[in-house]
Amino acid sequence: MTEAIKTDVLIVGAGPCGLFAVFELGLLDIKVHLVDILDKVGGQCAELYPEKPIYDIPGIPMITGHGLTESLMEQIKPFNPTIHLNEMIESVEKIGDPEFRVITNAGTVFECKVLVVAAGGGSFQPKRPPVPGVEAYEGKSVHYAVRKMEEFRGKDIVIVGGGDSALDWTLNLNPICKSMTLVHRRDDFRGAPHSVEQMRQLVASGKLDLKIGQITELQGDNGQLSGATIKLNDNSVAQIKCDAMLPFFGLTMKLGPVANWGLQLENNLIPVDTGTFETNVPGIFAIGDINTYPGKLKLILSGFHEGALMAQKAVKYVYPDKRVVFQYTTSSTNLQKKLGVN
């Protein structure tokens, strides 16, 4: 067997919650490795909405998913975590009290005192629209996420869906595209009321073509769209020109190997103690979207709070004989020295 990498804590998931947990653990002199199945840090922020504005991070009126990821990476620099990308945890074995041996699909072996599951909703993939042949255009002119807004400048865009993502990208991309069509199966939208109002203003001003119906056929060649056929709710048919399509039908979440780790599960989520965010297995914690408890809000800021409380319990496993005194970064010269600001 490959020689094990020994670390205090192994975090599964390098999204915002996992990254901020590095910061909280680092303040307590805890060494951390992270593993993520994606090829980049940032989790859903980086993979699904790197340029989408986020408005509910405390003290930051607006930041993109990419911007938040960069800021978190800058914040954890003093603690020099080791990040393993393109790897998925395949097995977890308890070898101590507590101590775990963790093996990835790449054969990397870890031995850690604490395991933190910060894997969002598990592995996720966009739901494919029920349009024949759509897979031939995926990645070329059919996109399930906007990674660079500039790629859509001057294009004829069709956006499909009626939720927040569809409305948000309708509003954000409308100023830079050549033309835009929004297609939804009914004239009733699930997004924020303010976004719905702004969308209808674009329709009224002639800047957005709203079609109530469903796309039934795509036209194009070699992965490049040229048009789409829409069956409208009045049974008529509309033909539109488009060279890019953005379907927002939500995500299919799969818990993946986490389901085989001996953790208690509730509707594919992990119940936790809200004082420590520890699972039913001592030494294994769950923070972020993957956990559940009464009153749970799936917000980034909630995951930050969970990471802070998790660290206060994790340190007792890492340093069982050490008396830990709670300190504030604003006044502790010790913490400021760790952060390189003193």
Curated annotation (Swiss-Prot):
MF terms (GO), sorted A to Z: ferredoxin-NADP+ reductase activity; flavin adenine dinucleotide binding; NADP binding
Positions bound to FAD: C17, D36, Q44, Y49, I89, F124, D289, T330
Keywords: FAD, Flavoprotein, NADP, Oxidoreductase
Keyword Oxidoreductase annotated: yes
Cofactor requirement: FAD
InterPro entries membership: FAD/NAD-bd_sf, FAD/NAD-binding_dom, Fd--NADP_Rdtase_type_2, Ferredoxin-NADP_redctase_2
Pfam families noted in UniProt: Pyr_redox_2
Reactions that this protein is recorded to catalyse: 2 reduced [2Fe-2S]-[ferredoxin] + NADP(+) + H(+) = 2 oxidized [2Fe-2S]-[ferredoxin] + NADPH
EC number: 1.18.1.2
Entry annotated with the keyword Oxidoreductase: yes
Cofactor note: Binds 1 FAD per subunit.
Family to which the UniProt record says this protein belongs: Belongs to the ferredoxin--NADP reductase type 2 family.
Subunit structure: Homodimer.
Protein name in UniProt: Ferredoxin--NADP reductase
Organism annotation: Rhodopseudomonas palustris (strain BisB5)
